[in-house]
Amino acid sequence: MLSIKLIDKYYPEENELKHILLTHSRSVADKALWIADNHPELSLDRDFLYEAAMLHDIGIFLTKAEGIYCFGDKPYICHGYLGADLVRSEGYSRHALVCERHTGAGLSLEDIVKQDLP
């Protein structure tokens, strides 16, 4: 499976961070598949949904969020585009779009400027 291979590449050790990532990503993937199964009229690509859901947070290890064992140097909000860069470099540009676009929903321009978000 593409997603597990990439996760294992960037998270080679079995540790709390990998456990958190996998648990969360599986929950997101399960919800995405539930939506696909309950809305056949959308004709969604289940394989893509699963893989993209599993990979959407792959960039978290590059961020600073010590509460979830992330000891990188970038703000957590950056994990989307950081993960997209990783996934894109592996040749999966469609999956990268999901990584980079899943963060920031509901933020106004004023919030972004006020909080000095990237």
Language model feature labels by segment:
Residues M1-S3, E13-E14, L42, S108-E110:
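General structural signal for secondary-structure boundaries
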Residues L2-H24, F61-G72:
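Active-site flanking loop/helix segments enriched in acidic
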Residues D30-D37, D85-S89:
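Short glycine/serine- and small hydrophobic-enriched flexible loop segments
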